[in-house]
């Protein structure tokens, strides 16, 4: 069975070794044929905490790593220039 892959944007990086990736799925409405956008948020494993807010990433399906985390960061496609702030 092939592993699923998704491309999305990091919308939260506040957790340790975890990021939230928003994936936008666009499809035509079955009756009205208008293009509808649906956003799904996935929690993905980021072991080195390399992703920051706004990064475009590719995630892949993996074994369950926690109660809600079943995806892992495969690669960072577009890195944002936003520097991560250090809390004091």
Swiss-Prot record:
Keywords: Ribonucleoprotein, Ribosomal protein, RNA-binding, rRNA-binding. The keyword Ubl conjugation does not apply. GO terms for biological process: translation. Pfam families: Ribosomal_S17. One of its GO terms (molecular function) is structural constituent of ribosome. GO terms for cellular component: cytosolic small ribosomal subunit. CDD domains: Ribosomal_uS17 (cd00364). The keyword Ribosomal protein applies. One of the primary rRNA binding proteins, it binds specifically to the 5'-end of 16S ribosomal RNA. Belongs to the universal ribosomal protein uS17 family. HAMAP family: Ribosomal_uS17_B. Part of the 30S ribosomal subunit. This is Small ribosomal subunit protein uS17. The gene is rpsQ.
